[in-house]
Design a protein with these regions (language model features):
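Charged, amphipathic alpha-helical coiled-coil/dimerization segments
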Residues: 27, 77-125
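Residues within helix-turn-helix
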Residues: 58-59, 70, 77, 97
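Pre-recognition alpha-helix immediately N-terminal to the DNA-recognition helix
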Residues: 18, 29, 45-48, 107
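Short capping segments at the starts of secondary-structure elements
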Residues: 53-57
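The alpha-helix within a helix-turn-helix
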Residues: 62
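N-terminal leader segment of winged-helix/HTH proteins
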Residues: 1-37
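Key DNA-contact positions within bacterial/archaeal DNA-binding proteins
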Residues: 42-44, 70
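Short, locally clustered residues in the helix-turn-helix/winged-helix DNA-binding domain
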Residues: 20, 48-52, 113
Length: 126
């Protein structure tokens, strides 16, 4: 059997693996800073969308973050339980769920600014 035929399937020949490993490393380096504000990385990027847009549909947020509703729904419920956002059905189209940042969510933004300061030290170690 020709082993060269399978060389393309070796992990070191896959572009996807270094990207995956890099993504994992970035999240690992963010974790200590995010722990300080009691957010996961995915919750953090969801909040960044809300800080920028103030109010979005779940569908729009999913498009921005490349996440499906099955992943977003529990994440948004946890953020809502923490008081950082509200989820309300659209009065114009009840199929749409509108997510809006709360005052507590805006206050979290002020605390999250320190993430960007800490992130600079992450870049120095890479």
């Amino acid at each position: 059997m020709d082993n060269n035929r399978y060389d393309a399937l070796k992990i070191e020949n896959q572009l996807c693996f270094p990207l995956y490993a890099c993504s994992r490393e970035i999240i690992k380096r963010y974790t200590p800073f995010l722990d300080a504000i009691d957010l996961t990385y995915t919750q953090y990027i969801a909040m960044m969308i809300l800080w920028e847009k103030k109010s979005v549909t779940v569908k729009e947020m999913g498009r921005c973050l490349y996440l499906d509703s099955g992943t977003l729904t529990p994440l948004l419920k946890k953020l809502e339980a923490k008081g950082f956002l509200t989820r309300v059905r659209s009065t114009q189209d009840e199929r749409n769920l509108i997510v809006t940042v709360t005052e507590a969510g805006e206050q979290l933004r002020e605390r999250a600014v320190s993430i960007q300061i800490g992130r600079a030290s992450c870049r120095e170690r890479v």
